[in-house]
């Protein structure tokens, strides 16, 4: 499978919003305006997976000094600090027909590598309980139930700390 990972561009907005709609229930999905703001605010940490010229997935999140995601981060771009300590992951989306083929793994590994190269302390995300094990495979550690109540769902705080070598 020939997948190309690249940085988002403003022209990707429509396809990104469509992928999100396909991947998340309405209560949890980010809207087009959210993505417009994210693309403008932190394009370097918004990666796209493309196959045959079509977006099939993406990963995105701000860079912050926070050690866990809070709901305000999704709406308030002031949490983004270009030289922040932690790379967050707001969403890791892959369209259903392309899942279980390593696309999400490629996206996550690329963002982890990018965060390491930028000198970040680590990465943070929230996930549902059924995905804890998946993220642990990348080295994330479960820090318990999150303060986040985004979409009226129980989320778990996951953090990946980089070694300081």
Where are these predicted regions, by residue range?
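A short beta-loop-alpha structural element at the N-terminal edge
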Residues: 2-16
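Active-site rim helix/loop that mediates acceptor-substrate recognition in acyltransferases
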Residues: 26-56, 60-79
């Amino acid at each position: 499978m020939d997948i190309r990972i690249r940085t988002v561009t403003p022209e990707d907005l429509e396809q990104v919003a469509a992928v999100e709609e396909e991947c998340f229930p309405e209560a949890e999905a980010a809207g087009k305006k959210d993505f417009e703001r994210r693309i403008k605010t932190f394009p370097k940490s918004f990666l796209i997976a493309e196959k045959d010229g079509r977006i099939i997935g993406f990963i995105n999140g701000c860079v912050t000094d926070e050690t866990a995601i809070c709901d305000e981060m999704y709406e308030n771009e002031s949490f983004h600090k270009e030289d922040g300590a932690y790379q967050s992951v707001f969403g890791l989306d892959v369209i259903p027909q392309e899942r279980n083929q390593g696309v999400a793994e490629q996206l996550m590994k690329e963002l982890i590598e990018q965060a390491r190269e930028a000198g970040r302390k680590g990465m943070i995300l929230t996930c549902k309980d059924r995905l804890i094990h998946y993220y642990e495979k990348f080295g994330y550690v479960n820090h318990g139930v999150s303060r986040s109540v985004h979409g009226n769902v129980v989320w778990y705080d996951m953090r990946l700390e980089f070694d300081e070598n």
